[in-house]
Curated annotation (Swiss-Prot):
Keyword Cytoplasm: yes
Subcellular location: Cytoplasm
NCBIfam families: RNAse_H_YqgF
InterPro entries attached to this UniProt entry: RNaseH-like_sf, YqgF, YqgF/RNaseH-like_dom, YqgF/RNaseH-like_dom_sf
Keyword Nucleus among UniProt keywords: no
E.C. numbers: 3.1.-.-
Protein name: Putative pre-16S rRNA nuclease
One cellular-component annotation, GO: cytosol
Organism: Buchnera aphidicola subsp. Acyrthosiphon pisum (strain APS)
């Protein structure tokens, strides 16, 4: 089963793809966004190409589990995916995924590797693999 994951952000949205047999994901791309709104044609192209069973969207929460300012925008993004593309969308806790992504990238490439695009797509992989491991 193929699954796409999104690491939602106001300016950048990381994308990863994976499958449940290996429980592994890989980074695809980073979509530019304006106030959390991506180019929907690019999203459509990804969905048509990969034909995922469903989509996982990272749910940004504070460490204590409460909502952040961006949480509602992430939920709105997930709802738009659901209705625009008639696909099941699941939200998944993304606490500390950006920190983990930065750590992974830094270990591999040092400070030069810490580019925003790599961080968001790596975070999307972490969200996806976390979802696979939980379910």
């Amino acid at each position: 089963m193929i699954v796409i994951a999104f690491d939602f952000g106001i300016k950048k949205i990381g994308v990863a793809v994976g499958e449940n047999i290996t429980k592994k994901g890989r980074p695809l791309s980073v979509l530019n966004a304006q106030n959390g709104c991506p180019n929907w044609q690019l999203v459509k192209n990804l969905i048509q190409y990969w034909q995922p069973q469903f989509i996982v969207v990272g749910l940004p929460l504070n460490i204590n589990g409460t909502k952040q300012k961006i949480t509602n925008k992430s939920e709105k993004f997930a709802n738009l995916l659901k209705y625009k593309f008639n696909i099941v969308v699941k939200m998944h806790d993304e606490r500390l995924t950006t920190v983990e992504a930065k750590s992974i990238i830094f270990k591999k490439n040092g400070f030069k590797g810490l580019k925003e695009e790599k961080i968001h797509s790596c975070a999307a992989v972490i969200i996806l693999e976390s979802w696979f491991n939980q379910y």
